[in-house]
Amino acid sequence: MKLILIYLILVFNLFNFINCQNILKVSNVRFAQTHVIPIEGKSWNIQGSTKHMSIVGKRRALLLASFQDQNLSYFATIWYDGGKVGMIQLNDPSQLPLTEDNGEKYSKVHHSGMIPKEWVRVGMKIQFSSFGGINGTEVSDILSPDVGQDYTLKMWILPFYLFGANDTNTQPFSKTKGIDSGISKELIEKWSCSDLQADNHPIQKIDWPYFVMEPRSGNPAMVITNSDQKKDGYAIMNGVLSILWLLRGMFGESSSSIQIYSPLLHLDAKGRYADTYGGLGGSSAGTGNHRFTGIFIHEQGHAMGLPHAGEAYDNKRKYPYKQGSLSGSEWGFDANHNEFLGTFIPPTAELYKTCKKNSIIDSKGRCVKQSVMQSGAGDQSSKYRYSMFADFEMTTIQNYFKNSIYYDETNGKYKKWNDTSKSYYAYKPITKEKGFEGVDENTPIERNVDIYSIIFTYSTVEKPKVGKISQIYPLLKSKGNLIRQFDPTNKKEMDSVNPKLNGEFKWYCNSSGCDYTIRVTFYDSSLKHVLLQQGKRKYKLPTGSFRDNINDPKSSDSFMLGGVNIKANKKIKKVELLETPFAWNGIPKNPTVLVSKSF
């Protein structure tokens, strides 16, 4: 019996010895998408808050791994949910993709291979293996990459043609209405997303002979008919941005991740094209010139929540790399060109020859790139349209998508991402704070129907028949969405928003009151009333006094930009802005008409 026991122990130890010998040792495993990051993702601690960058799901990735014996053949097997998805053979280090402009190699020790996007998903497992070594077949431990959300970045392009700008004297609509496939492919490589869908907005374009500027920088609201009349360089773009935010709300997209960008084409006092020489962006929208180059990607960075990198660095190091540079960032990777993007400025870059005047210099005497969000345009190789973001900035972009509501067109339902379970879940939009932020998170109640978009401006200080600040822009007809609206002639609906009652939406008017109504008259003489969630009251005092500066023409308190979408099942004859203070009490038969326009 004792001999049998000794024999079993020897066999057991021999089995363990063989197994130990057959375990393949692998190190420094990385995934390259926008940036080359560890398989477990990358984290930063910023002011006591952890920021994390994950691998993006449903996006191809270059797999990199280092092995002790570089001369063997290595394979990576992808597993999912207990089943084998597929296997790829890794290229040896001599075949590692090059660096832009034939720069320094990323590594001399990494084997590599491209993993198809279909294999990159939450729950995937990777196991490496080798054949032909002195130990025979060797397999590694199973590794679990930190794969996160998969999502498509959807973007509307809505050109603004102002002051007589048209296809002939500026740029043709065929070029400004969207971005071509080449640009889209490069943007996907720069943005942390699974895919990009950029289309012309359903409105197609906005073509107005004049533009109403809100009070800004100590100047009153004004109507301008050429770009030279603006008081500062960003004034018109600021007004365009306000309209884009308004449209996102009108179309029920304010809680979504859908972005909107407007190429701005306008004429100066002599009827010539006037460049924007810059851009503005934020809160899912951006505007600038029509070229879709550095300004465009910078402003859409702001649209996704990114600040200027240098300013964030100076502000308690909320950006981790010196002066808004990429000094310390992981390298980038472009799968379209199958090459690495160093954090240093390459020889063919526009700014290469003069970069040492202003750039940070690395330990090898090279100029370090700046982030796209801090003067980085021009730091890229001449083959690229755009320069790089820092790896850290991908955390903000990823969070932008994690916090959004998604509409699933396949089943007509909504979903959100749960970052703990790493999965989408069915979601029903809710009304927050009793309607203070709108109803059902301002999601549409009808989609893809014929609509009119009505946009207006109103000044509380403009005298009747003097000036044109209080006006209604030309109607915009398109296919679009409708959100929940309230009719001030319907008592039941008004009771639901009455701040004095305990209705479902009793805080709907809490921001500034509900003092205005849009009235639409159709050619069949029927009427439609839409209560606006806008007023002239102090914040959270819907029944209280007016805002302090409501009579100051230089204050935003005296100006209102508003709009609604209505179904285009009838032809509109007239649109009016009515003064309907405390509209929840009902409106008079003959309310004061503040603005009127016939069509």
UniProtKB/Swiss-Prot annotation:
Position of the signal peptide: 1-20
GO cellular component: extracellular region
GO molecular function: metal ion binding; metalloendopeptidase activity
InterPro entries: Dictomallein (IPR051256), Peptidase_M66_dom (IPR019503)
Origin superkingdom: Eukaryota
Keyword Amino-acid biosynthesis: no
Keyword Isomerase set for record: no
Cofactor note: Binds 1 zinc ion per subunit.
Keywords: Hydrolase, Metal-binding, Metalloprotease, Protease, Secreted, Signal, Zinc
Cofactor(s) essential for the protein: Zn(2+)
One Pfam assignment: Peptidase_M66
Location of the Peptidase M66 domain: 145-407
Compartments it resides in: Secreted
Gene Ontology terms describing biological process: proteolysis
Top-rank EC class of the record's enzyme: hydrolase
Location of the active site: 299
Entry EC no(s): 3.4.24.-
Binding site for Zn(2+): 298, 302, 308
Similarity comment: Belongs to the dictomallein family.
Stated name of the protein: Dictomallein-2
